[in-house]
């Protein structure tokens, strides 16, 4: 149902239950769900069973009394055609054809806004994701973060939040020093495996590319920074470090552009040190009595906030542990006015959650407990030609996002080849690969491990989930082209006043009714997915919607001689196409007109 329909019907049920309950009774919210069998109706409600004990009533008898009161409520009369009691006290409802038709009309009138809420009505939210170290190309784990984070940001935007996308660069610490030493070794002619190759060095081919460009004195720049020109001097380790970090940030920018992800802000870890924020956070915790010294180190009393043991903040060598700059960074999020913050990270960050939250609570600056929220994802395994792929020649030790996009795109075209050739619209050349990677990485819950099958991503049949969904959209477009010619979109307005009885009334096929019901679920599905921080639910929904469409297409011929039936079925398809477009837009996947 439409949100307003659900609200009115829930209000009718709630008022009925309240009239039967003691004045001081605590009542659960009334909810509706789709019955497992279509024969049981359009909706089911279990409120009678939920409150029977509190009302000291038999659930079935209570359900009968609720039904009688709801049937007399004018808010329900225009929505509900009939109600039946099943089993121990379920209330099954059949909706009126008018209520079903209102859904289709809402989709057609609201168009690209169907399912969306007014921007800003829920305040602002910061979503941090990807946040890779600038020490190498983005790997498939970063790709899963990018797909999850961007889809979640889109989802929250659809639900009325002002969304701020942020990338936190870990550009300080020992890994950056290892990067600089690795590039320096290549500038001196050493390679992985040589006796003089540094023990902690990075081995990918990209290190050699950076070294060659550094020796050539080239200039590189990242999307949010000043250009950096290489000194060309192999002994100038500071110049090598700055050049290498900026070079890799630019490479990551290219990967994100290919993936269709844009950030509002890039925050540098190094700035937390130069601005004195890390030291300020530490001194703030010391001043609040949340720390103590032991064995030459400074410890944070994280057990005060539920951690299993206290944690070292400052090691004996004077350096800070990993979570300390994270505490400082999150104080900036709070100070910038982001009262809701969501971090999308790998499951290997699980251990830092309690530490960061304990640090924020210890500062006692008004940050609520449980801040920030986290969405943690598990690892991705890549399969190609029936075998697991563990190593990329470019990266040296892992499969990159760029590899995955290029492999899933089909053909021999590469992103680097397009860039070197000066192809201005190069990202559009990789739409197929981008769509496949984004959809696939959202096709499982974040907390489950995922196997990315490149061979499956290349298939053009129903086995491929993104093809299955996109083909539903393309097939609808083909039907409309047969109906209205090349300019069919301009004729869709003709369907606005269509009599929809053929797809919502007594003579409508089960497939048409099921498709219409699925369209009605879209707004509430988005709201639930946003509330649960679960963008995978959108991908799940789109697969179900595509399945309902294909079932309808196989059951009901659309372009029939009966004009009233034809127009009603075209209106149903126009609504289906719109919801497919909207759902795909939420997860950042294209809706092609032809395939």
From Swiss-Prot:
Checking InterPro entries in the record gives: aa-tRNA-synth_I_CS (IPR001412), Arg-tRNA-ligase (IPR001278), Arg-tRNA-synth_N (IPR005148), Arg-tRNA-synth_N_sf (IPR036695), ArgRS_core (IPR035684), DALR_anticod-bd (IPR008909), Rossmann-like_a/b/a_fold (IPR014729), tRNAsynth_Ia_anticodon-bd (IPR009080)
**Alphabetical list of SMART domains matching this protein:** Arg_tRNA_synt_N, DALR_1
Keyword Nucleotide-binding appears in the UniProt entry: yes
- Please classify the protein's predominant subcellular localization into one broad category: cytoplasm
A UniProt-annotated Pfam family: tRNA-synt_1d
**GO annotations of cellular component type:** cytoplasm
- Provide the reaction this enzyme catalyses: tRNA(Arg) + L-arginine + ATP = L-arginyl-tRNA(Arg) + AMP + diphosphate
The protein's UniProt keywords, in alphabetical order, are: Aminoacyl-tRNA synthetase, ATP-binding, Cytoplasm, Ligase, Nucleotide-binding, Protein biosynthesis
Signal peptide feature range: none
Assembly and partners are described as: Monomer.
| Name of the protein this chain belongs to | Arginine--tRNA ligase
Question: What would be the name of the gene that encodes this protein?
Answer: argS
């Amino acid at each position: 149902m439409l949100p307003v329909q659900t609200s009115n019907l829930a209000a009718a049920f709630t008022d009925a239950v309240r009239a039967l309950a003691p004045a001081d009774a605590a009542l659960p919210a009334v909810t509706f769900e789709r019955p497992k069998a279509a024969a049981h109706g359009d909706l089911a409600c279990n409120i009678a069973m939920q409150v029977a004990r509190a009302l000291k009533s038999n659930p079935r008898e209570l359900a009968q009394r609720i039904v009688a009161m709801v049937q007399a409520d004018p808010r329900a009369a225009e929505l509900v055609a009939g109600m039946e009691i099943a089993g121990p006290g379920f209330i099954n409802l059949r909706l009126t054809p008018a209520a079903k038709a209102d859904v289709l009309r809402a989709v057609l009138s609201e168009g690209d806004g169907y399912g969306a809420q007014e921007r800003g009505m829920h305040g602002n939210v910061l979503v941090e994701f990807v946040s890779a170290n600038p020490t190498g190309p983005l790997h498939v784990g970063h790709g899963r973060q990018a797909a999850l984070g961007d889809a979640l940001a889109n989802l929250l935007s659809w639900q009325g939040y002002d969304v701020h996308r942020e990338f936190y660069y870990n550009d300080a610490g020992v890994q950056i020093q290892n990067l600089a030493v690795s590039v320096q070794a290549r500038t001196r002619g050493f390679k992985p495996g040589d006796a003089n190759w540094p023990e902690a060095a990075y081995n990918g081919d990209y290190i050699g590319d950076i070294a060659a460009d550094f020796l050539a004195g080239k200039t590189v720049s990242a999307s949010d920074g000043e250009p950096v020109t290489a000194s060309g001097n192999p002994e100038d380790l500071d110049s090598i470090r700055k050049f290498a970090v900026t070079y890799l940030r630019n490479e990551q920018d290219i990967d994100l552009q290919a993936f269709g992800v844009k950030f509002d802000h890039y925050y540098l870890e190094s700035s937390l040190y130069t601005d004195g924020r890390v030291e300020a956070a530490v001194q703030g915790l010391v001043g609040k009595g949340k720390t103590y010294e032991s064995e030459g180190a400074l410890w944070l009393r994280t057990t005060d906030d539920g951690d299993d043991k206290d944690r070292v903040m400052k090691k004996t060598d004077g350096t800070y542990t990993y979570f300390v700059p994270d505490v400082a960074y999150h104080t900036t999020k709070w100070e910038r006015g982001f009262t809701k913050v969501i971090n999308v990270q790998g499951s290997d960050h699980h251990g830092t959650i309690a530490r960061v939250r304990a640090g924020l609570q210890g500062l006692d600056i008004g940050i609520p407990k449980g801040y920030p929220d986290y969405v943690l994802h598990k690892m991705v395994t890549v399969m190609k030609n029936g075998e697991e792929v563990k190593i990329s020649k470019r990266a040296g030790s892992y499969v990159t996002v760029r590899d995955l996009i290029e492999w899933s795109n089909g053909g021999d075209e590469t992103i680097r080849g397009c860039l070197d050739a000066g192809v201005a619209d190069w990202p559009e050349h990789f739409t197929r690969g981008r769509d496949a990677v984004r959809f696939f990485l959202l096709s499982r819950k974040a907390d489950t491990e995922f196997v990315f099958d490149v061979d499956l991503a290349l298939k053009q049949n129903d086995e491929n989930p993104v093809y299955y969904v996109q083909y539903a959209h393309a097939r609808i477009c083909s039907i409309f082209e047969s109906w209205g010619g090349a300019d069919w979109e301009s004729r869709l307005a003709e369907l606005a006043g269509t009599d929809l009885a053929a797809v919502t009334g007594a003579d409508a096929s089960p497939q048409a009714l099921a498709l219409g019901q699925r369209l009605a679920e879209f707004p509430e599905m988005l709201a639930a997915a946003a509330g649960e921080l679960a963008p995978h639910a959108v991908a799940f929904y789109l697969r179900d919607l595509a399945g309902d469409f294909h079932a309808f297409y196989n059951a009901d011929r659309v372009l029939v001689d009966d004009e009233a039936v034809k127009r009603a079925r075209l209106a149903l398809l126009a609504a289906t196409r719109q919801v497919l477009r909207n759902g795909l837009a939420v997860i950042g996947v294209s809706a092609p007109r032809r395939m």
